[in-house]
From Swiss-Prot:
Organism: Ruminococcus flavefaciens
Keywords assigned by UniProt, alphabetized: Secreted, Thioether bond
A Gene Ontology cellular-component term: extracellular region
Gene: FlvA2.d
Record-given protein name: Lantipeptide Flvbeta.d
Post-translational modification: Contains LL-lanthionine, DL-lanthionine, and DL-beta-methyllanthionine, when coepressed in E.coli with the flavecin synthetase FlvM2.
Length: 64
């Protein structure tokens, strides 16, 4: 199991999608956002490598 899969499984075990959305909504500030994620075949994974939201579109549809 790769590191991204492990991170996703840890998140999935502790929070459902609505809780993750609430957490991200509270932390995203548009262009200054530090929340990063990557879409994979198993879902969206928070990451320190990829920025999933363009600076003008940090919205739930962008994140997920």
């Amino acid at each position: 199991m790769d590191n991204n899969t492990e991170k996703f499984n840890e998140l999935a075990a502790i929070a459902d999608e609505s809780e993750l959305n609430e957490m991200l909504d509270e932390n995203i500030t548009g262009a200054g956002s530090t929340i990063q994620c990557v879409n994979t075949t198993i879902g969206t994974i928070l990451s320190v490598v990829f920025d999933c939201c363009p600076t003008s579109a940090c919205t739930p549809p962008c994140r997920f």
